[in-house]
């Protein structure tokens, strides 16, 4: 996404980059704008956004379609409780549709709720790789 563009225009560009045609973008745009929860700020340039506002916009665009692989990096750590809850629900929908979600998070409850498999990285090295409960038990014991 581009800082010099408005949030709305970034949504359009982001959806076009995901392979949607202009008509599909027009149809999807209102729902994506609403999901961001940015209100009137959606028509401001992204360079004026806080980091949380940027994260909301990025997450909304990335999850507006059904990619085969979705990478989410700490996105559920931003925003108010309502946004975090609807973001978690959106991730659940992607997982239910057999999509692969790679979630980067330090939030153990989020990991427990969202992940079937966990890879614990520390200092760039894999410490553990396996079922969520097993890896988190090792992590918590360390």
What is each PLM-predicted segment?
Residues 5-16:
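Q-loop/switch helix immediately C-terminal to the Walker
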Residues 22, 26, 32-48:
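Conserved ABC nucleotide-binding domain
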Residues 64-72:
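A short, proline-enriched helix->beta-strand linker immediately N-terminal to the Walker B motif
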Residues 84-97:
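Helical segment within the ABC ATPase nucleotide-binding domain
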Residues 105-106:
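H-loop/switch region of ABC-family ATPase nucleotide-binding domains
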Residues 111-113:
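A short, surface-exposed alpha-helical micro-motif characterized by mixed small hydrophobic
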Residues 129-130:
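ABC ATPase "signature
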